[in-house]
Design a protein with these regions (language model features):
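Substrate-binding pocket helix/loop in short-chain dehydrogenase/reductase
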Residues: 96-98, 102-107
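A short, exposed helix-loop element centered on a Lys and neighboring polar residues
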Residues: 121-122, 167
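Catalytic loop of short-chain dehydrogenase/reductase
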Residues: 135-161, 166-167, 171-175, 190
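Canonical Rossmann dinucleotide-binding motif of NAD(H)/NADP(H)-dependent dehydrogenases/reductases
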Residues: 1-29
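Conserved glycine-rich Rossmann-like NAD(P)H-binding loop of the short-chain dehydrogenase/reductase
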Residues: 24-41
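The beta1-alpha1 cofactor-binding region of Rossmann-like NAD(H)/NADP(H)-dependent oxidoreductases
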Residues: 35-36, 59-70, 103
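C-terminal helical subdomain
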Residues: 185, 203-262
Length: 271
């Protein structure tokens, strides 16, 4: 029985991944900073294949390296080994240009989106190197491909750095483990969750520009759709430095090509 650990997985894309992994026969360890959300997520997971899979929840702040080590230790103690570790935890940035962001807002984005991935990868790599195998996935996002937009500068900066870090760590793994520890990227594309309409978990809604909504309606997908594609490919992957991509160039081109015939409205704006 294999085990997956997912950070930031009490809701949204992380929880959808957890459910799909459990449906696929994995023991699942979810983690989040919000204990109430975590308990609700655990109850949902425990109803999936209860006869032959297990779920565990661990409160974890990814900006705290000790929390991440305790997350690994809890998973290893419960299930023996950790086969897949996913750095999923992330926050959006307030919809403001850099000159209007506070130092606290800047630090929070970098601490969660970048440092959280670095700290999580460090813990997972050490554990997987010791056990002799494993896969580490870090979630890419807007900015990973050098895309730029006012209001997303700090988020994009963090995600671009995550891409460089992950690819460089994959090279280190090749040198140190011969690729036994596979360090990879997960590129889900545009997901329709409250992540894109709220910043830092704030209840205040971000009203997206109409142009942005139009693009999201063409290219976006619900996380349930995305995990049906990416999770089986993560499970089957045997390559170090792999990139599991949902919104490929071909898929994006097809969406734009058919946008005039297939109307999609994720924001309920149709009159």
């Amino acid at each position: 029985m294999k085990t997956v650990v997912i950070t930031g997985s009490a809701r949204g894309f992380g929880l959808c991944q957890a459910k799909k992994f459990k449906e696929s026969g994995f023991n699942v360890v979810i983690s989040d900073i919000n204990e109430n959300n975590l308990q609700s997520a655990l109850e949902a997971l425990q109803s999936i294949r209860p006869q032959d899979t297990k779920a565990l929840s661990v409160v974890c702040d990814v900006t705290n390296p000790q929390d991440l080590q305790e997350l690994w230790d809890s998973a290893a103690q419960a299930f023996g080994t950790v086969d897949i570790w996913i750095n999923n935890a992330g926050v959006n940035s307030p919809d403001k240009p850099v000159c209007e962001l506070t130092e606290k807002e800047i630090a929070f984005i970098l601490d969660v989106d970048l440092k959280g991935t670095v700290y999580g990868s460090r813990v997972a790599f050490a554990g997987m190197r010791a056990q002799g195998h494993g896969q580490i996935y870090s979630v890419e996002g807007y900015g990973s491909n050098d895309a730029m937009m006012t209001g997303l500068t700090m988020y994009g900066t963090a995600k671009r750095a995550v891409t460089f870090f992950t690819r460089s760590l994959a090279k280190e793994s090749q040198d140190l483990t011969g690729g036994q520890v596979k360090v990879c990227r997960l590129t889900p594309g545009i997901m329709i969750t409250d992540f894109i309409t709220h910043a830092n978990g704030d209840a205040t809604r971000i009203e997206l520009p109409e142009k942005t909504k139009k693009v999201y309606n063409i290219l976006g997908d619900y996380p349930e759709t995305i995990v049906d594609y990416v999770v089986p490919r993560m499970i089957a992957n045997e390559k170090n430095d792999a990139d599991i991509v949902w919104l490929t160039n071909a898929r994006a081109f097809s969406r734009f090509l058919t946008a005039g015939f297939k109307k999609r409205d994720f924001f309920g704006d149709k009159k």
